[in-house]
Each structure stands twice: as structure tokens, then as C-alpha cells.
């Protein structure tokens, strides 16, 4: 049993090694196959390019093995890099100079400001009494001006109040005159109405008097006529009884 197991294990190991070898061989074959067409393609492209150039002579090379075109490109690139470095350095110097000039200007302005402030302070110290006197004078002048303006304002307010009072009085007077005119007009209208009423009353009394007189006159005529008729009747027949008539007086 132990021998069979060892044999089987050795066989399996041998088969594994053989598989690995076959795989490596196949891979190497594939690589060689894949490399061959690439080389063929390169050789073909080179031959094609040579054919396209029509047998033009190859570029010349310098002592370092570079072609002239590559050397020219390298030199051009170096010059451009050098120009860029020069330009960067120039810009840096310009900025540095601008910074220095600005610092100089700021320092100059600061010193000038300090100098001016110191001179002003010295001048103020020298003219302190004169300045105080001038300040007092201006204060007094301003006080007088303010007092004059205050008096003018008070006078203006007083005058405005007087004008307003006068306007109110004029308005009240005009209102009073208008009221008196209205009262007078009303009194006149009342008097006219009363006079007209009195005239109407007199006319009515006169008309009533005339009506009463007419009635009395008619009554007298009627009585007279009755008397005459009675006389005529009495004259015709004395046997008839005497008629008596009585009339009530109408108002």
C-alpha cells in the first residue's frame, strides 16, 4: 500500500512537471510567434519608409551621435529655457524694485507726516497764547451773533404772533359784521312780514266791515219791503190779522 501511494505521488508530480514544461514551451512558442510578426512589421515599415524616401541620404550626426535636426531642436529648447529663466529673473527684479520703491514711498510719507506733525505741534506751542486769544475772540463773536440771531428770531415770532392776532381780529370782525348784516336782514324781513300781516288784517277787517254794512243794508231794505207789503195787505183787508216778522241780526 505504501509503495503504491509513493508511485502514484511520483507519477502525479511527474505529470505536473510535464504539464508545466509543455505550458512554458507553448508560451515561448506563442511569444516567438508574436514577436516575429512585430519584427517583420518593423522591417517592412523601415523598408517602406526607405522606399518612400527614394534613397535619400541619411541625416548627419554630430560627435555625440545626435542628428543635426535633434541637435538644433535641443539647442532651440535650451535657448527657450534660458530666455524663460532670463524673463523670470527680469520680472522678479522688477517686482523687487516695485516693492522697494513702495516701501521707500511709505517710509518717506511716514517721515514727512511725522515731521509735519512735529512742526505743527511746535508752531502751536509757540502760538498758544495767540491761539487762545483768537479762540476767545471767536467765541465772543459767535456768542454775539447767536444773541443777535436769537433776538431776531424772537422779534420775528412776536411779529408773526401780532399778525396772527390781527388776522384773527379781522376775521372775527368780518364774521361779526356778517352776522349783524344777517340779523338786520332777518329783522327787516320780519318787519316786512309783520307789516304785510297787519295790512292783511286791516284789509280783512275792512272787508268784514263792508260785508256787515251790506248785510245791514240788505236787512233794512228787506224790513222796509216787508213793512210796505204789510201796509198793502192791511190796506186791502182790515180783517186779516197783522203779520209780524222778526229777523235775527247776522254778524
Curated annotation (Swiss-Prot):
One of its GO terms (molecular function) is transcription coactivator activity. Keywords: Chromosome, mRNA processing, mRNA splicing, Nucleus, RNA-binding. Disruption phenotype: Morpholino-mediated knockdown produces embryos with heart edema and decreased brain size. Embryos have imparied movement without lethality up to day 9 post fertilization, after which they die due to an inability to feed. Residues 1-53 are annotated as: Necessary and sufficient for RNA binding. Transmembrane segments: none annotated. InterPro entries: ARGLU1. Disulfide bonds: none annotated. The keyword Nucleus applies. Residues 54-251 are annotated as: Necessary and sufficient for transcriptional regulation. Residues 49-63, 71-92, 215-231 have a biased composition (Basic and acidic residues). It is found in: Nucleus; Nucleus speckle; Chromosome. GO terms for biological process: mRNA processing; regulation of alternative mRNA splicing, via spliceosome; RNA splicing. GO terms for cellular component: chromosome; mitochondrion; nuclear speck; nucleoplasm. The N-terminal region can bind RNA; preferentially binds 5'-CGG[AG]GG-3' motifs. The non-classical LXXLL motifs are not required for nuclear receptor coactivator activity. This is Arginine and glutamate-rich protein 1-A. It comes from Danio rerio. The lineage of its organism: Eukaryota, Metazoa, Chordata, Craniata, Vertebrata.
Amino acid at each position: 500500500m505504501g509503495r503504491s501511494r509513493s508511485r502514484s505521488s511520483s507519477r502525479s508530480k511527474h505529470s505536473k512537471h510535464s504539464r508545466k514544461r509543455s505550458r512554458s514551451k507553448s508560451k515561448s512558442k506563442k511569444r516567438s510567434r508574436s514577436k516575429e510578426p512585430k519584427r517583420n512589421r518593423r522591417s517592412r515599415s523601415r523598408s517602406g519608409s526607405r522606399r518612400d524616401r527614394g534613397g535619400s541620404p541619411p541625416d548627419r550626426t554630430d560627435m555625440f551621435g545626435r542628428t543635426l535636426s535633434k541637435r538644433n531642436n535641443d539647442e532651440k529648447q535650451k535657448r527657450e529655457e534660458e530666455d524663460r529663466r532670463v524673463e523670470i529673473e527680469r520680472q522678479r527684479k522688477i517686482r523687487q524694485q516695485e516693492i522697494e520703491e513702495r516701501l521707500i514711498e511709505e517710509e518717506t510719507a511716514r517721515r514727512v507726516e511725522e515731521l509735519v506733525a512735529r512742526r505743527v505741534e511746535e508752531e502751536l506751542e509757540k502760538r498758544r497764547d495767540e491761539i487762545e486769544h483768537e479762540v476767545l475772540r471767536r467765541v465772543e463773536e459767535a456768542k454775539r451773533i447767536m444773541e443777535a440771531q436769537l433776538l431776531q428770531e424772537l422779534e420775528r415770532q412776536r411779529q408773526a404772533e401780532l399778525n396772527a392776532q390781527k388776522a384773527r381780529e379781522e376775521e372775527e370782525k368780518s364774521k361779526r359784521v356778517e352776522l349783524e348784516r344777517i340779523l338786520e336782514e332777518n329783522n327787516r324781513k320780519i318787519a316786512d312780514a309783520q307789516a304785510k300781516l297787519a295790512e292783511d288784517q286791516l284789509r280783512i277787517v275792512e272787508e268784514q266791515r263792508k260785508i256787515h254794512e251790506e248785510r245791514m243794508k240788505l236787512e233794512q231794505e228787506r224790513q222796509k219791503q216787508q213793512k210796505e207789503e204789510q201796509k198793502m195787505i192791511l190796506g186791502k183787508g182790515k180783517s186779516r190779522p197783522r203779520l209780524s216778522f222778526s229777523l235775527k241780526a247776522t254778524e
